[in-house]
Regions:
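N-terminal phosphate/diphosphate-binding loop that engages ATP/GTP or pyrophosphate donors
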Residues: 3-92, 108-110
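Conserved catalytic-core segment of NTP-binding enzymes
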Residues: 104-176
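Glycine-rich phosphate/diphosphate-binding loops that line cofactor/substrate pockets in enzymes
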Residues: 89-95, 157-158
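Conserved beta-strand elements of the Class I
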Residues: 1, 30, 127-129
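Structural recognition of the conserved hydrophobic beta-strand(s) that form the central parallel beta-sheet
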Residues: 32, 98-103
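A short, structure-level motif marking secondary-structure boundaries and short turns
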Residues: 2-5, 101-103
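Loop/turn-to-beta-strand initiation segments
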Residues: 95-100, 127
Length: 176
């Protein structure tokens, strides 16, 4: 389960890279983005799912629409939503050694993303890799932000938390 620590960390880029790396290691890889998060103006298929399908020939399940997910959450139907997602995940697992699951990205309109990601990871009994990108912050600030997100999934020492991928890293001087 690939979980972002914040908006703009390059989650889809990391997911694509992870799929490619696992394929190169000889594994049969599936991909699953449970919840579509369209960008403003998007009218076609969900971007992550379409990118993986086109670049790797994988046929992931169609993600649930954000409107559908928000309606279910608003109606207190979290358990039913998770069951629906688990059914789709099971489709993604067919014939694969491993499935890369891309979590929700927090936005102004989806501030609940971290909570949903936690429920998804637990329901799928998934191992978690956090993805972060340093903004204009020193390493201690970045470390604190990553550790805070790791706590959501049981803490950095939890065996389900595999680690963190830092994306968009600049030179050492800019991180000092």
């Amino acid at each position: 389960f690939i979980a972002p620590t914040d908006f703009g960390v390059g989650l889809t880029s990391i997911s694509l890279g992870l799929v490619r790396t696992l394929e190169r290691a000889g594994l049969k890889v599936g991909f699953f983005k449970p919840i579509a998060q369209p960008h403003p103006g998007d009218t076609g298929p969900e971007r992550s799912t379409e990118l993986v399908a086109r670049t790797h020939g994988i046929k992931p399940p169609v993600p649930l629409s954000l409107a559908h997910v928000e309606r279910m959450l608003g109606d207190g139907q979290l358990d039913e939503l998770l069951e629906e997602i688990i059914r789709l995940y099971q489709q993604a697992c067919i014939g694969n050694d491993v499935v890369v699951v891309e979590g929700m990205v927090p936005t102004r309109h989806a501030s609940y993303a971290a909570r949903v990601n936690l429920h998804l990871a637990k329901s799928l009994d998934a191992e978690v890799i956090l993805v972060s990108a340093p903004e204009n912050e020193v390493l201690s600030e970045l470390s604190g932000r990553v550790e805070l997100q790791a706590q959501l999934f049981g803490g950095p020492r939890d065996p389900k938390v595999l680690g963190v991928i830092l994306n968009k890293v600049r030179t050492e001087e800019s991180m000092a």
